């Protein structure tokens, strides 16, 4: 069986200044803290849920 999990590249494109506290915590949980910083994460349901809450601050690319 091929159980390969796809990855996604997430880049922060807007600042967290002036955003709700929970949105800031989500960015930290994703490993983002500066504009134009990118991380590559597994495309799991928990990551998808976090990305959905702050998608207006991010650029998402499938890998």
Swiss-Prot record:
GO biological-process terms attached to the record: translation
GO MF annotations, alphabetized: structural constituent of ribosome
Pfam families (alphabetical): Ribosomal_L30
Domain of life: Bacteria
GO CC aspect terms: cytosolic large ribosomal subunit
InterPro entries: Ribo_uL30_ferredoxin-like_sf (IPR036919), Ribosomal_uL30_bac-type (IPR005996), Ribosomal_uL30_ferredoxin-like (IPR016082)
Keyword Ribosomal protein recorded: yes
Chain segments annotated as coiled-coil in the UniProt record: none
Keyword list, A-Z: Ribonucleoprotein, Ribosomal protein
Keyword Ribosomal protein recorded: yes
Subunit structure: Part of the 50S ribosomal subunit.
Entry's family note: Belongs to the universal ribosomal protein uL30 family.
UniProt name for this protein: Large ribosomal subunit protein uL30
